[in-house]
Amino acid sequence: MKKLKINYLFIGILALLLAVALWPSIPWFGKADNRIAAIQARGELRVSTIHTPLTYNEINGKPFGLDYELAKQFADYLGVKLKVTVRQNISQLFDDLDNGNADLLAAGLVYNSERVKNYQPGPTYYSVSQQLVYKVGQYRPRTLGNLTAEQLTVAPGHVVVNDLQTLKDTKFPELSWKVDDKKGSVELMEDVIEGKLDYTIADSVAISLFQRVHPELAVALDITDEQPVTWFSPLDGDNTLSAALLDFFNEMNEDGTLARIEEKYLGHGDDFDYVDTRTFLRAVDAVLPQLKPLFEKYAEEIDWRLLAAIAYQESHWDAQATSPTGVRGMMMLTKNTAQSLGITDRTDAEQSISGGVRYLQDMMSKVPESVPENERIWFALAAYNMGYAHMLDARALTTKTKGNPDSWADVKQRLPLLSQKPYYSKLTYGYARGHEAYAYVENIRKYQISLVGYLQEKEKQATEAAMQLAQDYPAVSPTELGKEKFPFLSFLSQSSSNYLTHSPSLLFSRKGSEEKQN
């Protein structure tokens, strides 16, 4: 029996060695027999997108954006790296799918019947409507009926082209438009505010973000109803990628991650106020340059631009501001709070900013550790505005009403209830002006978006002006000038020192295509 056992062992080992030796010659060895297997064998998920404030951009060299963040998490879910290719317009995105250069398109693309004939849609995650925009002060059309190709231009591959054709066939036979093959929707909106173009069409979310920096852009009319936004992948008999996407989004929905990401990028609201935004941006030009050094000096755990947005919400950057309730100064501190922080003069801008930051940091340190890092600031700001105890009540109420107390998206919805007796009467700390705290945080977020985008727009303009100057005044030798070389760098520094940042633009478009490895 012992000998027989040894023979079987020998045969087994021999068979195993033979199988290993022959394995590479088997026809299906190494072949990725489905799309997910191919992605995992390659070790990277190839995603094509476009530069917009919402989908994909960079600040301080770091990529961010709703679609980028979701794509990065999906790549992690698959256990591979993310490779991002940035294209100029929507047509180029679908070319990537057609040519096998992308696994997915993640670019805020609208689901529609024409696209799904040729491409596989994924789960939908938010919705937009298509809107016609014009420049404030120019003629506002009330209908599409009389628009011509000389007035209306849209981006290539834009989903609205199908809607325009339907409207032309059924309602407005005189309607015509032009497609600019070289520009995306953001660039066309820039052309509108610069007076180069009368009208263009973009989605409602893109317009809302653009208006934070360019309040002179206005909506003339809606072209479509709300349309779901989705990702697209190749359409064939292989459904493994679609199944993985469905599982991924279901998991994100169940654990609240999707809601948190959407709150981060879409939670600023759409109640755009032209006058308020214009007033704020004028203050950025006129007042901020004097205060910027103080914001940069005392902002520690937060971005100085967020601190500036907080101060504007508090006092409109007025160091002498006083409210009927007795709060005073740049950061509108109460007398008791100022005394506890060692502030001797609340109307001294530096003391007020320094004290306000320390008070905010104290609120930040009290926010429960279970709150995600990138949402802690919003809980702290709510506490800064209405008191830490009432913020705890808001969290408790969120739990009682089956929400997530660690999700700002859930908690902020309950804030207005703190001033309603059926709710505050059952809470530990009673009545609070929760609706004011809600508006307070939302306004700060809007001012921050406007400030970041506007300063970076200034950087773009300064760079373009410098490049134009270099073209207009080409380099010559000191001998030819009879003096020192033209102080080009000095000019750039002086003309833009109040605005230059070390980050690429948030709200202006990029040309060409780029690839990023993450």
Curated annotation (Swiss-Prot):
Entry keyword set: Cell outer membrane, Cell wall biogenesis/degradation, Lyase, Membrane, Signal
Membrane topology listed for this record: Peripheral membrane protein
Chief place of localization: membrane
Location of region: LT domain: 270-518
Active-site residues, Swiss-Prot/TrEMBL: E314
Residue numbers spanned by region Non-LT domain: 22-269
EC primary class: lyase
Signal peptide: 1-21
Subcellular locations according to the entry: Cell outer membrane
Similarity comment: In the N-terminal section; belongs to the bacterial solute-binding protein 3 family. In the C-terminal section; belongs to the transglycosylase Slt family.
NCBIfam families linked to this entry: PRK10859.1
Role: Murein-degrading enzyme that degrades murein glycan strands and insoluble, high-molecular weight murein sacculi, with the concomitant formation of a 1,6-anhydromuramoyl product. Lytic transglycosylases (LTs) play an integral role in the metabolism of the peptidoglycan (PG) sacculus. Their lytic action creates space within the PG sacculus to allow for its expansion as well as for the insertion of various structures such as secretion systems and flagella.
Protein name: Membrane-bound lytic murein transglycosylase F
